[in-house]
Amino acid sequence: MSNTKVSGCIGLLALILALPVSAGKPIDNDGDGYNANLDCNDNNSLVWEVNSCGVCEVEPLGGCNASNPHSDLNWADYPTACISCHDGGIAGTQYEEMFGSTHYQWTGDTPDMVNQGGTLQGKLTNAVNSYCINIEGDWPVCGSCHAGRGVKPGEGDSKANVDCLMCHNKDYALNRVRKPDGSMGPSDGTAQATLDSYVQNIAAPSRTNCLKCHAYAGGGDGVKRGDISSALMGNSDMHFDVHMNVAGANLECQDCHKFESHRVIGKGSDLRPTDDIVRGAEVTCSSGTCHQGMDSGSGHAASGRRGEPDRHVARVACQSCHIPTYAKDLGDPSHVPTEMNRDWRFHHDGTPADGVSGAGHPHTDKLANQTPEFKFWNRKSDNYLLYDLGVIDPLTGRYPTSRPMGDVNDGKLTPFKYKTATQPMTVADERMIALDTFEYIKGSGDAITAIESGLVNMGYPVNEPYKWIETDTYQAINHGVNPASDVAACSQCHEETLDLTTDSKLDAMGYRLKGPKEQVCAQCHDGSKNLPRTWDRMHNHINKGTTGIGCNFCHDIERVERNLCDPCDSSCAAEYVDNIAYPHQCN
């Protein structure tokens, strides 16, 4: 509403307050159906009201019913009534904020991407993954979780396409479907009273609102994330998730994923845009009033807990110890497994995707109670984009669609879901094909037809040669935190005894010795002493002598935060090296 209209409203309100109060309902002078109160525009054609409360009240957010200012709205008012107040009107600029957010645009700036980081990226356009591959050709299905009313962003949409109720009424969110005309909204046949209740009962987003989409990402409940499923809507098991359970903390998603101006912090390693560039993408466990000081290096011991975690927090993410498994199955029938492999050559029942048996979902392998893979992550990712040249990862033998960046000296050890897929790629230029998932899932069900449609959508000829390849992805695990009494055992990373003849889990992460055992150990030992066979005894080297022996005496890693002796520092190294010096590379 313009300032002129608001001023007119306030002036009219002052006049109304000066008039004597008469019994009975006011006359509906403008015939708009609102007569519970004197309407803003009953005697002023230059302004309008959105409900019988009137939009020109001195305290607009209170309305005539302070507990529910939307109580007199009806379904026909949606979204016009919302826009009149929330698009630069008396209630704020929420439409403008939401319209520009990643939740609506599905693309955004990508400061955390090493692959074409200066470009706009997102699921609306160029994102490719090992699930539904790419959205090209499949807006009717993939777009059903878009925060809009049906129109694809950039194709004639406007702020009126923003679907407020998707996040602000959980009953509406559960009943929201793709309608025959392509729009999104309540299913046909929904009772008028139910429709009216959607616009009359507006609330902050609940877990149900968020999970209606996020739990079903990738094509089904719990399919994509491994740590997010519909079970979190009403979970009461602390061991399933200590934060999101109705018998415990009962946190809402936005308690951690803080929103400002409809932009949110926090995203997975495989997601490209950063919604709020100023605040960044990371949710920290010790922010605000939660777990204060636990990342300080002394917080665990100070709180009366074990002290070992304190020496890990600088290099190990909280999730690595506090989420020992994902896709949990604790005997509750609502808990669901997660997808670990997908093969587009076959339908879900194992039959060939040749169109004979009709449309259907691709074949998937789903598992529960999975142990994460661990990688060092520095918050940067290399995520495949449409038309990128595919390059095999020599460590896995597969084409990656998402890789967390970092190494033993750069980043924190973080738990990941590792997942594979079989999907098509062009032969000549080795680019992953955006198989037309709508053709596959809702059309013929023929993989060849879906590939040909995808090729055409990408600008290739329909007969462009293709091949089947294996892809893989890493996805950070962040939800499903266990109670503090049930953290991962040290053996999840540290084997019970040392075996220097083969690579351990930690060796594979960069902790292997920097040279042959005999040469590394000979710096300090003459061979007469047996090698410690346990991790804790080996770790005691950092407590030796005046300063402690630095990690890079034996490994190609540095832990400067511990202030240990560096082998290149002659002022302290002589205290430890008393046998055969190792040829360390010193600057």
Question: Where are each of the predicted segments found?
Answer:
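Sequence context of c-type cytochrome heme-c attachment sites
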Residues: V55-S206, K212-S286, Q292-P309, T414-T420, ...
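Soluble extramembrane regions of membrane proteins in the secretory/endomembrane system
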Residues: A368-K412, A421, A428-Y460
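Repeat-solenoid scaffold signature
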Residues: A281, S286, C290-S402
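N-terminal signal peptide c-region/cleavage motif recognized by signal peptidases
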Residues: A18-P20
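Bacterial N-terminal signal peptides that target proteins for export
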Residues: M1-I10
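Extracellular calcium-associated, cysteine-rich motifs in secreted modular proteins
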Residues: G24-G62
